[in-house]
Amino acid sequence: MNDRLVLFGTKGGPRLIKGGSWPTSQALVLNGNVYVIDAGLGVTRQFIEAGFTYDQLESIFITHHHSDHNLELGGLIYTSWVGAPAHKINIFGPSGLKKLITHFIESQSFDINIRILDEGLHDIRECFSCTEYTQGVIFEDDKLKVEALRV
């Protein structure tokens, strides 16, 4: 698989218009691994439409807490959970990320508990790790180095 950047959405702001672009979200593909940058509305559908699988999803990076960058983070986490990736997904974002995810999971607790009981899924909190960052290098592996700065 070729290294590439896939643009899921390029529109600023959360308002949608017929025939318009989706809000901000991209996927950086390196050696077959997918790193999602921002989770604007539509990211989950665009991820699947691009032909990716949840097993390819390595990390999610949220650049800042505007709705056009994080509105569908919960949905992406949730669908990756029911898609049963073979590994933990790393999620990085600025201060407030853990609260955002915790509140989403709490809002879906009824459905999550039913799926754990009926479908035998593991706890959703076990499918990801969450790291809040400030500035500097926030992630580095053998394929990618990510540095955050205040703008």
Indicate where each model-derived feature is located.
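Binuclear metal-dependent hydrolase catalytic cores
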Residues: 1-151
